[in-house]
Amino acid sequence: ISPLGSVTKKNQDSTAYNWTGNKTANGNWPVLGICAVHRKKDIGGSGNSPVIPFGTTLKTDKDIWLPDGVGYKSSFNVDDTGSGPKKTDYWIDIYYSKDTKAAINYGVVKLSYTYST
């Protein structure tokens, strides 16, 4: 049971992405600890706004290793949008900075997460 005012998304795809040289869809320079989510139009809605609002903190059910000495984290802030073709509706794409090898090795990991509304 989720606490009042929280949402849990179970068994969602997660992937990792790398720095492109651009700011996030929210207008910030990307930092380790952020993630991207689908835009509403990617899952049958309309518009470019994210399916989970920017600034929302997602708490994952497993620790995820991040590169560059960050280590393991289970909390990620939504600050970007992306396209995850053939991924679950509430897929998350975790920012891995410039460590392309680590992002590729991450692959697709199923996880669940909770966030406050």
From Swiss-Prot:
Biological processes annotated in GO: defense response to bacterium; killing of cells of another organism
Keywords annotated in UniProt: Antimicrobial, Bacteriolytic enzyme, Glycosidase, Hydrolase
Domain of life: Bacteria
Further remarks about this protein from its record: Usually lysozymes have a catalytic site with Asp and Glu, but B-enzyme has no Glu (two Asp for catalytic site).
Protein name: B-enzyme
Coiled-coil regions listed: none
UniProt EC number: 3.2.1.17
Catalytic residues in the record: 89
Enzyme class: hydrolase
Catalytic activity as recorded in UniProt: Hydrolysis of (1->4)-beta-linkages between N-acetylmuramic acid and N-acetyl-D-glucosamine residues in a peptidoglycan and between N-acetyl-D-glucosamine residues in chitodextrins
A GO MF label: lysozyme activity
